[in-house]
């Protein structure tokens, strides 16, 4: 009887801990933590309540194509994105576009649910040290484990993006106030035709800097018009984290 009770207690504790970690992980991905941090003091995040920000598998990183490993067996990304009316929120660090539909991505045999996308200016990931004006992160979560997958899209100045017009024109007037958009969007409009990518294991690029995030960076950039870029940077012109040491990590390249 005693053994049964101890086993039951252990099972309950395991369930509680797993549920707590899953909840915290999903919350950190759903919305940026808006307390006690800013981009001007990004190097101090680990000393101001976010110790994981000094971890050894942090994001973003610089990509050097010559040092990546081309793996013949890397699978294609399978996007299952559908039309939906998004929910928009200015979370005091960026404009965030929350899911309000059924959108998934399958990668390496796992299917992840789309949670939200948001903007960084300039790009956080660099290519041989070079930045682009904007980087978009599409954040996804494994519904079973809570594991996170982030698809990064570099954005150059060029042709306007119709989807982003709908989003930028619906920017909420009040910060931290989520509004439902009446516009219909499809996330495939944020993706190029060529979906070759770089991938590595990193972290969220904002506090709490949760590690173990799978990053997939689409090689071919998309474009926004100069006016669209300015519309974002007039409000947030420095919401990027500096590149972090790669340490012993490998960046893989699909072809």
Residue ranges with predicted function:
Residues 4-6, 10, 25-255:
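Alpha-carbonic anhydrase
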Residues 8-18:
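Sec-dependent N-terminal signal peptides
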Residues 18-19, 46:
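Residue-level signal for mature regions of secreted extracellular proteins and peptides
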